[in-house]
């Protein structure tokens, strides 16, 4: 239950920053604060070392089964850039731990904003030196795709029905007619290859 509750704090913590209710803090800091609050709520006494260790779990996330093969297939024809609400140090660790072959990491701390703020999507296009209509955001989150589409980016929904755990009730399916809707990254590669 603690783990699920901690994961559920992700978006509300970022929203407090986005809405000006809290000063800018990167995602590791937000995860740490959420963990401290939940530890108190659950009556757990976590010392500094344990707080750091548990917060560090986010740095060692495992990729979905299709991720590596799909990314390598896509990388043969496209630039692959992570556009993440994670901070750069977090995403570097995730990439190294999982062997993710990103060409570039575009993280929230580069922009001082979290998605779905426009500064993140447009900042990514600027850093890639591409107009929005030549950039495709691939995501498992409909809110993310909606914000990207509103700014002119192409969109691809990747189904991840366990993204939020076994009780997931949101983002189970595409909620709009995105440019592409794929079951995984290998399916996305097949669809892109067929449309080329």
Model-derived regions: residue spans:
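A metal-dependent, Asp-based hydrolase signature
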Residues: 3-52
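Alpha-helical elements of Rossmann-like donor-binding domains used by nucleotide-donor carbohydrate transfer enzymes
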Residues: 5, 33-37, 53, 69, ...
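Asp-based, Mg2+/Mn2+-dependent phosphohydrolase catalytic module
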Residues: 72, 86-196
């Amino acid at each position: 239950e603690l783990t699920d509750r901690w994961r559920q704090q992700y978006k509300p913590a970022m929203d407090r920053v986005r809405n000006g209710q809290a000063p800018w803090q990167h995602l590791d800091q937000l995860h740490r604060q959420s963990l401290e609050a939940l530890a108190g709520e659950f009556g757990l006494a976590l010392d500094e070392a344990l707080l750091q260790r548990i917060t560090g779990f986010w740095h060692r996330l495992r990729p979905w089964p299709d991720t590596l093969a799909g990314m390598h297939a896509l990388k043969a024809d496209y630039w692959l850039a992570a556009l993440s609400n994670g901070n750069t140090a977090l995403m570097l660790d995730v990439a190294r731990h999982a062997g993710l072959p990103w060409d570039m990491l575009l993280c929230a701390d580069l922009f001082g904003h979290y998605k779905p703020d426009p500064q993140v999507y447009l900042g990514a296009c600027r850093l890639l030196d591409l107009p929005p209509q030549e950039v495709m955001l691939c995501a498992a989150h409909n809110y993310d795709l909606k914000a990207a589409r509103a700014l002119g980016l192409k969109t691809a929904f990747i189904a991840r029905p366990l993204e939020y755990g076994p009780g997931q009730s949101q983002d189970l399916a595409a909620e709009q007619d995105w440019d592409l809707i794929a079951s995984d990254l290998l399916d996305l590669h097949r669809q892109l290859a067929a449309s080329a």
